[in-house]
Amino acid sequence: MLDPILLRKDLQTVVSRLKTRGVDFDTQRFNELEARRKAVQTETESLQARRNALAKQIGQLKAQGQDASAVLAESQAIPARLKQLEDDLAVVQQSLGDLLMAVPNLPHESVPAGASADDNVEVRRWLPGPPAADGNPPPLPFEPKDHVALGEPLGLDFDTAAKLSGARFSFMRGPVARLHRALAQFMLDLQTGQHGYTECYTPYIVNSSTLYGTGQLPKFKDDMFFVTKGGEDDDPKVDERGNALAREDQYLISTSEITLTSVARDSIIPAANLPLRLTAHTPCFRSEAGSGGRDTRGMIRQHQFDKVEMVQIVHPETSYQVLEDMVGHAEHVLQLLELPYRVVLLCTGDMGFGSAKTYDLEVWLPAQNTWREISSVSNCETFQARRMQARFRAAQGKPDYVHTLNGSGLAVGRALVAVLENHQQADGSIAVPKVLQPYMGGLTVLQP
């Protein structure tokens, strides 16, 4: 959530920066609510002062033996009006909160302005060998197969997945399932062993309050999987008087960024305990409501996929250096897997809702002859922290909001796709990257 004080002090700057994201902020609605808030607070303060003055006057009149009934009558009418103003203020603040909850983060000044992915800026690329003339990885010396053709003989089974669950799911058995597990274990070991993250196991189901805190709700409700408990609709919960209790909404997580970042929710962390570096390997569930039929073949865009997530909760002064560090942590995974990739700085129009600055890592897929996203690393600054009330306190001074950062380290399914395609051999076998061989029982080649 944006800083309300910044909106009050410099609304036009906020509006201009949001326009670079293609967002038109409703200034009329905001100004109306702000005017109402100020009016309510001004009247409240005036009435409180009047109440205090009347109390003093009543005491003086009684001490002098004079009639205080008129003053007392005025004083007795004030509490009811104060209660009404308190209720009015709560309504206004809720409306302001609802308005701001739907507004994305402000882009950092270093983010290039742009409308779409076409305006993103490549920062660097890394190839395990010499590039071709166009700067991309050289073509394979044979016609490359895509990950579906390579994976099916190794146990990648989309027909069974479709029978069990429908489209955009995967079923794996045998060598390809083992490779998928090896990738996840390798990523976790690297992030915990070399990059200083603490491994976590988190719930896969969260309540709506958690999702509001990290920014998935309300904007991305259609991309979430809603969870209904068995029998809940047939046997609604009631209180001791028989009144129906509101059902608590629960959702499957779309990323463990949600659960890892929410560790700091409603808490004040001693500054000496920062940074918090957390990682987890979890399944992620997305409805892909806005995918528009893209990437229907294979594992690129799934309703369920695994990811190793990196989250850091840090002091505001360090967050942009931490962002660069986290990009390096994701790059390290790709380099050890000997996968060609490039780092892209997203423009204002292509960033995620809660991000102030985002880098995407895109891996090369020979069969598609293109780069595809495999990791996204973002600094959300205080955007999530304000929504979650996640703060820190130095030894001296008042609590202040932390900065939160998140990134994929990596998406396991897409890493599997990239390994299959980049390490394929002419006979359809897969050369196992050296770093994965200990996780594969010493196997060096996967034979179809």
From Swiss-Prot:
Cite the EC number: 6.1.1.11
Q: Which GO terms describe its molecular function?
A: ATP binding; serine-tRNA ligase activity
Going by the entry's taxonomy, the superkingdom of the source organism is recorded as Bacteria
What is one Gene Ontology biological process annotated in the Swiss-Prot or TrEMBL record? selenocysteine biosynthetic process
InterPro entries xref list: aa-tRNA-synt_IIb, aa-tRNA-synth_II, aa-tRNA-synth_II/BPL/LPL, Ser-tRNA-ligase_type_1, Ser-tRNA-synth_1_N, SerRS_1_N_sf, SerRS_core, tRNA-bd_arm
Positions of L-serine binding = T255, S256, E257, E309, S408
Cellular location(s): Cytoplasm
| Record keywords, A-Z | Aminoacyl-tRNA synthetase, ATP-binding, Cytoplasm, Ligase, Nucleotide-binding, Protein biosynthesis
Q: Its annotated pathway?
A: Aminoacyl-tRNA biosynthesis; selenocysteinyl-tRNA(Sec) biosynthesis; L-seryl-tRNA(Sec) from L-serine and tRNA(Sec): step 1/1
Listed under catalytic activity are:
tRNA(Ser) + L-serine + ATP = L-seryl-tRNA(Ser) + AMP + diphosphate + H(+); tRNA(Sec) + L-serine + ATP = L-seryl-tRNA(Sec) + AMP + diphosphate + H(+)
Sorted alphabetically, the Gene Ontology cellular component annotations on this record are: cytoplasm
Q: Which PROSITE patterns match?
A: AA_TRNA_LIGASE_II
Q: Name one Pfam family in it.
A: Seryl_tRNA_N
What enzyme category does the UniProt record give? Answer: ligase
Q: Which family does it belong to?
A: Belongs to the class-II aminoacyl-tRNA synthetase family. Type-1 seryl-tRNA synthetase subfamily.
Domain characteristics, as noted in the entry: Consists of two distinct domains, a catalytic core and a N-terminal extension that is involved in tRNA binding.
Protein task: Catalyzes the attachment of serine to tRNA(Ser). Is also able to aminoacylate tRNA(Sec) with serine, to form the misacylated tRNA L-seryl-tRNA(Sec), which will be further converted into selenocysteinyl-tRNA(Sec).
HAMAP family in the record: Ser_tRNA_synth_type1
Quote the subunit structure annotation: Homodimer. The tRNA molecule binds across the dimer.
Protein name according to UniProt: Serine--tRNA ligase
Question: What gene does this protein come from?
Answer: serS
